[in-house]
A protein has these predicted regions:
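Compact, glycine-rich, soluble single-domain proteins
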Residues: 2-63
Length: 63
């Protein structure tokens, strides 16, 4: 599978949001993170910082 770990970066702190995310959508509310089973999590007021598909890692940052 091609899931990626999603992290929220705040300064020097890297916090795991979801271990195996299949989709990330950036909305007005924040980042919507969805796994392969459809479980959703909303990270309020977050934007995409970096998507490293080689490392299967997606980094979010506060707005």
């Amino acid at each position: 599978m091609c899931e990626s770990a999603v992290y929220l970066i705040r300064g020097e702190v890297k916090t795991l949001v979801m271990q195996e995310a299949a989709k990330v959508a950036i909305t007005d509310e924040g980042a919507v993170v969805i796994d392969a089973l459809g479980e959703r999590m909303i990270v309020k007021d977050a934007d995409l910082l970096e998507a490293n598909l080689i490392k299967h890692e997606i980094l979010l940052r506060p707005r």
